Every structure is written in C-alpha cells, then in structure tokens.
UniProtKB/Swiss-Prot annotation:
Keywords annotated in UniProt: Chloroplast, DNA-directed RNA polymerase, Nucleotidyltransferase, Plastid, Transcription, Transferase
Gene3D superfamilies, per the entry: DNA-directed RNA polymerase, insert domain (2.170.120.12), RNA polymerase, RBP11-like subunit (3.30.1360.10)
GO terms classed as biological process: DNA-templated transcription
Organism of provenance: Pelargonium hortorum (Common geranium)
Gene it is expressed from: rpoAL3-A
Its job: DNA-dependent RNA polymerase catalyzes the transcription of DNA into RNA using the four ribonucleoside triphosphates as substrates.
InterPro entries recorded: RBP11-like, RNApol_insert_sf
Protein name: Putative DNA-directed RNA polymerase subunit alpha-like 3
Annotated EC: 2.7.7.6
Length: 365
C-alpha cells in the first residue's frame, strides 16, 4: 500500500457521530465544569474514545505551576512565620492557587524554573510581586499570598514546573530545602459513562463525559486539546518505522514497527488505544450484516488482526529520557501488518476528529 494514497474513510454521514455541549458551569474564579455527550457510536468506538480521552486529559493537558517554596524567613514549629498573619500552610496553599501562563510548547522538556518573591512589610504580598522567568506571567496579579504585619523582609525562592494532572513535580525535596506545594491540576476530575439505546431497529451507544477543570482551562478547550494531542501522536504512529516482516504458515503475516521519542505515559496509552483499534480493522470490509454477537466479541476466524505484542525500551538523548515503543502485529491474509496499523490509526484519527468541533461551539457561545 502506498502511504501517499492512504486516506481516512468516513462512515455514512447519516449515522456519523456528533457531540453536544450539554452543560457548563463556573465555580468562583478557580474551576469550570462541563458535560458532553457523543452519539451514535458502536460499542467498540465508545470504549476506545472513553479510554483515549481519559488518559489524554490526565497526562497530556499541561500547565505551569509553583511546586516548591524555599522560605528564608524563620518558621516557628513549621507552622508560622514571625510578622506574617497567615500560617505557613495557608501561604503554601495560596502559592498553589496562582495561575501561571505562557507558551507551553516553549517549556516542554525544560526546567524546573526559578521565581523569587522579595518584599518588605508591612504590606499585602500579591502574585504581581513575584519576579518570574521570561515568558511566564501570572493570570491574576492581585492573587493574595500573605499579609506582612511588621517591617520585615519576606523572601521566597519558588520552583516552577510544567505539570499534568497525574504529575507531582520533582521528588527528593527535603524539609531542609523547603516545602512542597500541592498545585491545582489542570484537570481536576474526569468521569465518563456509556448508555445504550435503540434507533431504527439498531443498537447504538452514547458516550457521556463530565469534567472539572482549573481555570483558565475550560472543559471544551481541554477536550479539544486532548483530542489534538491524540491525533498528533497517531500521525507519528502512521509513520512508524517498519523494522521486520515475515510470513508464517496458514496465511499469517508478522510485522514489527517502532515509534520513537515518546514519554512513558504516551507509550502506555498508545498501546491501550491501538490494541482496541486494531481489533476493529477489517469490519468495514466484511460482506453482509454484522450481528450484535459478532460486533461485541473478537472472533479470530473473522478479524484480520490475530495478535499484538508490545515492548517498551527507554533511552537517553540530550539529557532527557525517552521511550521507544515496538509493535509486533500479526495479521491474516489478505491484510498486511502495515495496512492494519494504518487503518487502525486512521480510525483513531477519524473518531477523535469529532471533538475538533468544540472550537466552533465555543465561538458560537
């Protein structure tokens, strides 16, 4: 198959899935809630979308946050600072609430970065008083940090890191070096559910997603970004390096591919999503109607994909750790392993492209 001639095959427009922005709420100045529904879907499509979105939202949506504070003022019993009204715990929580902005792509793979708060009382220390690295700004300059009640200096060295909802910043920080800050994650909560329904004598499924985000990220923006991350990654999978090929008995073909320069989280959920998509390969070529029983179970006599084996290998490059994902795909004639990989990746791109409509919906609002 010539890759230059390979294209997405969109299903029947009459039955093609569409999404609805069901609900949106804002809570104070910190959080936003959104609820979405996508239908009609097959059982396999809804499971694939559910898995992929959950992983992408929690691992691929990034934000800049303060993760560590080294306070030069003397602390009393690790609870209070002389001359400051707020407790140490309250001050650290206030740092964790500060929203930092910048062009995130410029900070990926770099850092941690250092910021300095150096003020003298009496005054109310705010986010605007922090000296930040170039390219990083605070979203709300008046965000409160601490009330300094006496004429004393208040000096804090802050660590800034690019974090996801599953990362906790750098580890190995002792109490002598400062205090860890628990930052507000970009995605605070993701729930999803699948409901079946009948229409026109056929069984379909509806995927419902609800999400709580930390501002300035809003739910439909997170859904758009997460889907784009998945699509960009599977564009790379489409171009995976073909390492080996062999033919076995009974029309079995085995192909080995390699996808490089991945993070650990990316390797894991590429494997999970791709496995589901590979076992969907070939269904659209089947002659005759599919019954529910055939559609809901994997029949080795029907599907052209017989097996998927994955292996992950870590390596160092320019001081950073990356992973290579090796994919061994077993197919049955006439489907070739590379054709199966391309068709599965194309199916993933087709499904997640549905959420690119979220940007248009946002413009309407």
């Amino acid at each position: 198959m010539d890759f230059s001639e390979f294209s997405l095959e969109i299903t029947n427009n009459k039955n093609f899935a569409d999404w609805d922005y069901v609900e949106c709420k804002y809570f104070h100045k910190d959080f936003a809630y959104g609820r979405f529904a996508l239908s009609p879907l097959t059982a396999k499509e809804s499971r694939l979308l559910k898995k992929g979105l959950f992983e992408a939202l929690l691992t691929e949506i990034l934000c800049l946050r303060f993760t560590h504070a080294k306070i030069q003022n003397e602390c009393v019993n690790l609870m209070n600072i002389v001359g400051i009204q707020e407790s140490l715990d309250e001050i650290l929580k206030n740092f964790g609430k500060i929203i930092l902005t910048g062009k995130l792509e410029e900070f990926v793979g770099k850092g941690p970065f250092v910021a300095i708060l150096d003020v003298r009382g009496p005054l109310n220390a705010m986010a605007v008083d922090i000296e930040l690295p170039p390219g990083i700004k605070v979203e709300i300059e008046t965000q409160h940090i601490a009330t300094i009640t006496e004429p004393i200096p208040f000096v804090v060295e802050l660590r800034i890191e690019l974090v996801s909802s599953t990362s906790k910043g750098e580890t190995g920080i002792t109490d002598e070096e400062g205090f860890s800050i628990d930052p507000n994650p970009p995605i605070r909560k993701v729930n999803s559910s699948i409901q079946g329904y009948e229409y026109g004598g056929q069984t379909f499924e509806r995927l419902s997603i609800e999400m709580l985000t930390s501002l300035p990220i809003i739910p439909n923006e997170a859904l758009l970004l997460g889907s784009m991350k998945i699509m960009n990654l599977f564009q790379i999978v489409l171009q995976a390096k073909y390492l080996d090929y062999k033919e076995l008995e009974k029309g079995i073909h085995v192909g080995v591919f390699c996808v490089s320069a991945l993070r650990a989280e990316q390797s894991k959920w590429i494997k999970t999503i791709l496995e589901d998509a590979l076992y969907m390969v070939g269904g659209r070529k089947h002659q005759g109607p599919l019954t529910d029983e055939e559609d809901d179970s994997i029949d080795s006599n029907f599907t052209p994909v017989q097996n998927l084996d994955c292996r992950i290998e870590s390596y160092e490059e320019e001081g950073q750790t990356f992973q290579r994902l090796f994919l061994e795909i077993w197919t049955k004639s006439p489907t070739e392993p590379q054709e199966a990989l391309w068709e599965a990746s194309a199916k993933i791109l087709e499904l997640f492209s549905l959420f690119l409509q979220t940007s248009k919906e946002n413009e309407k609002d």
